[in-house]
């Protein structure tokens, strides 16, 4: 396979717009994974720790593309947010990680919280295994409801 490419954009406007949804566009202005080009984008000018977290998020999408069946948006973004959250935590930015955890967005914030709940149940390796085998949450009747019952 071709290696991944990293492109740094001068501004959010220079990152390719792959989404037509305005909400998604607002969330993808600091980083983006472009599967067909095997390219990760990040906007220049942010602190190292933040750029590291953004690239970890995008790298999670690359990993999902190569190791997982096609997945629903909430699973894709929830898992990538979990990877990003772990990087932020490991770099010592607990207050930023807490803000990520509290994000009300049903795809990113709730997805992160559900992945953290699953990690508590099965560990990080167990979470990776589950993500590798899941297609989408709708096939689980409601994956979120299942986790709420745990």
Model-derived features: positions:
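Active-site recognition of the HExxH zinc-binding catalytic motif
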Residues: 53-66, 77, 81
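Post-HExxH zinc-binding segment in Zn-dependent metallohydrolases
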Residues: 68-108
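Pan-zinc metallopeptidase signature
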Residues: 102-150
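Auxiliary, metal-adjacent structural segments of Zn-dependent hydrolase domains
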Residues: 1-39, 44-45
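Short pre-active-site segment immediately N-terminal to the catalytic Zn-binding motif
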Residues: 35-55, 69-71
């Amino acid at each position: 396979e071709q290696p991944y490419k990293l492109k740094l954009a001068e501004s959010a406007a220079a990152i390719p717009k792959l989404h037509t949804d305005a909400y998604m566009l607002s969330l993808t202005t600091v980083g983006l994974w472009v599967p067909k080009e095997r390219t990760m984008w990040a906007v220049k000018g942010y602190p190292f720790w933040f750029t590291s977290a953004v690239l970890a998020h995008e790298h999670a999408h690359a990993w999902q593309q190569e190791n997982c069946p096609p997945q629903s948006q909430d699973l894709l973004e929830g898992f990538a947010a979990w990877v990003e959250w772990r990087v932020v935590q490991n770099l010592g930015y607990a207050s930023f990680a807490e803000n990520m955890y509290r994000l009300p967005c049903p795809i990113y914030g709730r997805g992160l919280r559900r992945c953290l709940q699953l990690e508590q149940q099965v560990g990080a390796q167990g979470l990776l295994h589950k993500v590798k085998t899941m297609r989408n949450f709708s096939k689980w009747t409601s994956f979120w409801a299942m986790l709420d019952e745990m």
